[in-house]
Amino acid sequence: MKIAVLPGDGIGPEIVAEAVKVLNALDEKFEMETAPVGGAGYEAEGHPLPDNTLKLAKEADAILFGAVGDWKYDSLDRPLRPEQAILGLRKHLQLFANFRPAICYPELTGASSLKPELVAGLDILIVRELNGDIYFGQPRGVREAPDGLFKGAREGFDTMRYSEPEVRRIAHVAFQAAAKRGKKLCSVDKANVLETFQFWKDIVIDVSKEYPDVELSHMYVDNAAMQLVKAPKSFDVIVTGNMFGDILSDEAAMLTGSIGMLPSASLDANNKGLYEPSHGSAPDIAGKGVANPLATILSAAMMLRYSLNRAEQADRIENAVKKVLAQGYRTADIVTPGCKQVGTREMGEAVLAAL
């Protein structure tokens, strides 16, 4: 099995290195090939997603991704910015389903910004559609306003749109995920204002007829954002569009104590996927050896489970992470009084020892 390893920018190379060590420590042997992406791709090839990197990603059975982005690239034209690499990979590989688990480990309830009783035992899965919505809708751009109160003034515009096949396929993925968990699915929309999301809601209701054992509910996105803080454990699986999912998944991440703990998977129709931590490249701490590698290590576990059909090995990694937390090891982002603060490499070594 071939894994494309794309470390990227900022803390990406540091955290991916620890995940690779963990994969190498398993009984399985994987063919792993590394390629530049993001700012590293721009520096090497003049583009955030070089042709050879994309070719490797297409040929691989799965992709382990670090993070992209750095302030020094903010002046580049948008198509050349590091963040375009992840958008390009999603588009070219048709990665339409994003899984973002938000799990609060018992040892980390004190690190959450909410009261322990609100987050203890928290286990939410956010299923986000990745290929449609306002992020990719056309037309978009800057122009002279053709009408309205400020006709003739410069305006920026984007297009929110979803096709029926796009909504149906993500709805099926979400219902199937909910069927394997608590059999509760909440579809988050803004159907009271947006035609696109009334359309979304109607299709999700239609798909629900194929999953009678899953309880379907609907919630407007503003209320969902509030309920995630007020009563987060009332959710099991959430399905939503690209932009709403982008925002809500980061909000849910912070309920757990640190976004540095949370993995993610972006899958195609055949479960080939790109696996990455939910956090960004954090250029402010790059090279300092303090980044939390656990989200990336847990992303590698998700890769084993979903794309490589190695659930037993995924369990080993996840159990090792739980053991390390129980032993009191903490990186700076999750440290609490009485725990042992360690750096990136030390945390990786602790997971290896726990394996």
Curated annotation (Swiss-Prot):
Catalytic activity: (2R,3S)-3-isopropylmalate + NAD(+) = 4-methyl-2-oxopentanoate + CO2 + NADH
Positions that bind NAD(+): 280-292
Binding site for substrate: 90, 100, 128, 222
Pathway: Amino-acid biosynthesis; L-leucine biosynthesis; L-leucine from 3-methyl-2-oxobutanoate: step 3/4
Cofactor entry: Mg(2+); Mn(2+)
UniProt: Mg(2+) binding residues: 222, 246, 250
Sorted UniProt keywords: Amino-acid biosynthesis, Branched-chain amino acid biosynthesis, Cytoplasm, Leucine biosynthesis, Magnesium, Manganese, Metal-binding, NAD, Oxidoreductase
Pfam families: Iso_dh
Chief subcellular location: cytoplasm
One term of GO molecular function: magnesium ion binding
Family, similarity comment: Belongs to the isocitrate and isopropylmalate dehydrogenases family. LeuB type 1 subfamily.
Subunit structure comment from the entry: Homodimer.
The protein's name in its UniProt record: 3-isopropylmalate dehydrogenase
Native organism: Cupriavidus metallidurans (strain ATCC 43123 / DSM 2839 / NBRC 102507 / CH34)
High-level lineage: Bacteria, Pseudomonadati, Pseudomonadota, Betaproteobacteria, Burkholderiales
